[in-house]
Regions:
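Long, charge-dense
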Residues: 50-73
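A structural preference for long, well-packed, hydrophobic secondary-structure segments
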Residues: 2-23, 65-72, 77-85, 154
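Structural motif
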Residues: 24-27, 45-47, 69-79, 106-110, ...
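Solvent-exposed alpha-helices and their adjacent loops that cap or buttress functional pockets
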Residues: 9, 18-20, 39-40, 71, ...
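Conserved active-site and cofactor/substrate-binding residues in soluble primary-metabolism enzymes
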Residues: 4, 8-12, 21, 53-57, ...
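Long, hydrophobic N-terminal alpha-helical segment
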Residues: 1-51
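Glycine-rich, aromatic-bearing surface loops/beta-hairpins
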Residues: 83-161
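Alpha-helical scaffold segments in soluble metabolic enzymes
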Residues: 12-19, 57-65, 94-98, 127, ...
């Protein structure tokens, strides 16, 4: 047993998240996503699972230990609804609330077309499948850095000189 870790995070998921470096990406996907075949093309090469939970709950667990990248404009991506790229379904609104809570600030999702999402997911470090049954519960997160207290302040994507 470990302290201060979300109990959803298995040893395999924790190892993958800890092994990721700055700029690596993790995919959190719904039960409709072709997770196994896509995961085989990733850096990790195998599928990770958080069965029995929805996407928002999985995001809460993952972002409890994974910082988002502040060096890029869009560290969080959502799969667009086919034919309706500006539609934000409930599953994505719930995920947005979890991202904002984890980061303590607004980090709006950028959207990505479905097939472009599949291609991006194949280049990710790993894929985590959830039990989310609603469509469009698929997201990509880019890992950031944690700096020591005495490190120089890092510029955010919108605040570079």
């Amino acid at each position: 047993m470990l302290k201060n870790l979300d109990p959803l995070l298995s040893a395999d998921v924790l190892h993958a998240l800890a092994s990721m470096g700055h700029g690596d990406e993790v995919v959190i996907c719904d039960a409709n996503f072709p997770a196994d075949s896509v995961a085989r093309a990733t850096v990790l090469g195998k599928l990770l699972r958080l069965d029995g939970v929805d996407s928002a709950r999985a995001i809460r667990a993952v972002l409890s230990v994974l910082p988002l990248d502040t060096f890029v404009d869009d560290p969080a991506l959502r799969m667009e609804v086919v034919g309706e790229p500006n539609t934000i379904p409930a599953v994505q609104r719930e995920a947005q609330a979890e991202v904002n809570a984890a980061e303590g600030r607004d980090v709006p999702f950028a959207s990505i077309e479905r097939f472009a999402f599949y291609e991006r997911a194949r280049k990710a470090y790993c894929v985590i499948a959830t039990g989310e049954q609603r469509g469009y519960g698929c997201f990509v997160f880019k890992k950031g850095v944690l700096l020591a207290p005495d490190a120089p302040p890092q510029a955010s994507a919108g605040n570079r000189s």
